[in-house]
Amino acid sequence: MYKDLEKEKYDFLIIGTNLTESALSAYLSKSKYKLIQLDISKSYGGDCKNFNLKDMEKFIEETKEKSTKDCSIKNISLINREVKQDSEPIIEKENFRQYNFDLNPKFVYAKSKSTSELIDSKASNYIEFNSVRKIYFMFNDKFLNVPFSKSEIFISNDLDLLEKQKLLNFIFSVMKLKNNNVDVNSTVDIKKDIELDDDYLFNEMKKNLNIKAMDFLKKNFNEKIIDMILLILANQTMNTKNMTVDQMCDKIYKFLISVQIYDNTPFLVPLYGSSEFTQAMSRLSAVHGSIFLINDLLTCSINYNTDYKKDDQNSGKFVIEINDGERNEKFKINADKIIINNSYLDDKESPIKFNEEIKIKNNSSDYVYKYSAFYSFKNIMELLTYKDGPFYYRVPKNNSILKNEYQLDAIRYFNNTSQVPNNRSLLQISITSDLNEDNKDTFINKAKSISEHFLKIIMDNIKEDILKNYNNKEFKSKCKFNRIRILEEIDRVKEEEEKRKKEEEEKKKKEEEEKRKKEEEEEKKKKEEEEKKKKEEEEEQNKKEEEKKEDKKEEEK
């Protein structure tokens, strides 16, 4: 099977099928480079993998046994929630393949370099998208629907008159500063030639492009608007704490020009999950002649080619010895350059081994922990907002109600993203640690508590929406049952959650009690052994003294 591979010399060996490696593979193969790509895994995707329900449960069991430094898969909590206690298990009742759990969900801007590259490379032929319908951010105990256009800002119930004026003026100032391609025929206000009512903010922005964005915002806005700007418009992460006003404006401009391209929000989400990106690029690479080896039983040894000759077309700078444990076959390939995913370099038990003489340029930076929790709901979400999603939530650190030490992101998926069955919806909560977090267990316990608290807040907000909007005809038409029935269903889910939490606490107490008893028994046993040993030593000592006395008597005699 592998004999033909040994005859060729490859320009590149790419190890890994993560997003970066897949994009490089597609680009290099289109540029006529000969390459071979391998991944020591059961499937494509790296940390962008998707799992169905059964595979997800297997994956969780595997990660319990073996920890990894890959920040995206550090800890995953799979929590299935049934509305009715007498329901059959989800895995038997429904088609488990209709679930797509996305380890590392990714959006793309509707108008950006990423979308242009996907279209130009024709990788978009292999991916289908849906738009994110609403973006919320949590301020105190409320989820605010973030307005982006002039009309949305004016009708927003979440902002007072002064806040509306300031936010609109800020958005217009950013567009005036960054928009070099004015479209007078655009139907979107912010893309036209903008005349500002007040130039003060624009002038301040222009003068202070190199100062920290946070310092600039604190001078001009309240906490609510600052969170809205940084978390939503600028898409802030923990790595953007020191960004300048100029960098912030670039991010916001990128956000704003993508609004109303396909929907009211700028984000597109791939159907079936983020693994579609890597698979589309891998297909594109394969179409242009790349060879792929995806096998979790491969091992590699990489060495310099001592017989390398520059003019020899069949000789590469590196010789890679590969062992296929499944077929029990060994073979060698020649390559001039090697690109490898950092996870293989960071893992001490990596199946990829380098000769000590080879110098490796490792671009890995500080890693973080990421906690993901998945909550699957039956009926409730469907009754309220069927096919209205997906929805995206962002919660800043230290929210007054949630009291979260870490930033929280959440996505609510519906069947229109092909990630859940028709009669279900999926809430995915992701919490990322700070760079200085060095205690994994402490982080996981805190993140778990935060995600459960956030779930309760989501459920309470749904309940409030029902009470507030039920008389609205459009809203009412989405509901299959009456209001009382829906509220009963929500209360039942919350009771289930409380019951589960109580059972977990009791189980934890029981385990701690058993552990304490075991430790006490061990301590008692240890003391008894020590006393026994001490007694034996004393007896031995007494025996020796008696013998000495006897010997002495004998001598005297």
Q: Predicted regions span which residues?
A:
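Glycine-rich FAD pyrophosphate-binding loop
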Residues: 13-15, 29-55, 64, 74-75, ...
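Beta1/beta-strand and adjacent pyrophosphate-binding region of the FAD-binding site
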Residues: 4-20
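Conserved Rossmann-like nucleotide-cofactor binding loop
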Residues: 20, 24, 43
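Long, low-complexity, compositionally biased polyampholytic IDRs enriched for Lys/Glu and Gln/Arg
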Residues: 498-552
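Mobile amphipathic helical/loop "lid" adjacent to a hydrophobic cofactor/ligand pocket
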Residues: 82-246
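Flavin (FAD/FMN) cofactor-binding core of flavoprotein oxidoreductases
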Residues: 398, 449-497
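Short beta-strand to alpha-helix junction loop
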Residues: 102-112, 202-209, 260-287, 293-295
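Mid-domain catalytic core of redox enzymes
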Residues: 267-269, 279-288, 296-448, 453, ...
